[in-house]
Amino acid sequence: MARRTKEEAQETRSTIMMEALGLFCQHGVATTSLSDIARAAGVTRGAIYWHFKDKEELFLALWHEMCAPLSHLLNASIDVDEPDPLGKFTTFLIEVLRTVAMCPAHQLMFRIMFKMMQPDSELTSIRALIQDEIQQHTQNMRCSLTNAVHRGQLPSTLSVERAAILLHCSVDGLIMNWLNQHERFDLAADAEALVQALIFSLRHNLGQP
């Protein structure tokens, strides 16, 4: 009985999160209330508060839920003992693009994120949360690239800072363009070639000034 209750609680939590994701994308994070989410999920506001302190915590839980399936690849690439950090990092970038292309929930999350990062974003508290997560992600990229340099997989002259900026902006740009114009290219099919082109540029350019 206790196990069933735990399973039901997890199902309720997942339902709340998925309904919130759709409403956030459709109506905006700021204008979507917890009452709106409760109605869509078929639960009470109290049920939401049982799982989440507030809307910010709910949004952050959604963010981490989207990131979790790929985190092991990025974590491996920032491990100083990993023998192939560049390989793990390359696979991570490819899988990010493929996952967005094939998973509607990830597409919704990126649409929300891109909207929230605009200068006139309506909810500064969640925008700050996103900025913190992006800064941590960029730092992890720098660690991955540094490990690759130390392993001789990238040139010692590589500017890790510039490389991280290039990769972050390129991946975001590919996702944003694909979300706006699916017909321009096949993100899932082209993911490996696009990422390999970026890695090639790191091997041959972006040296220190």
Whereabouts are the PLM-identified features?
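Hydrophobic alpha-helical connector segments
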Residues: A61, N75-L108, V160-L167, G207-Q208
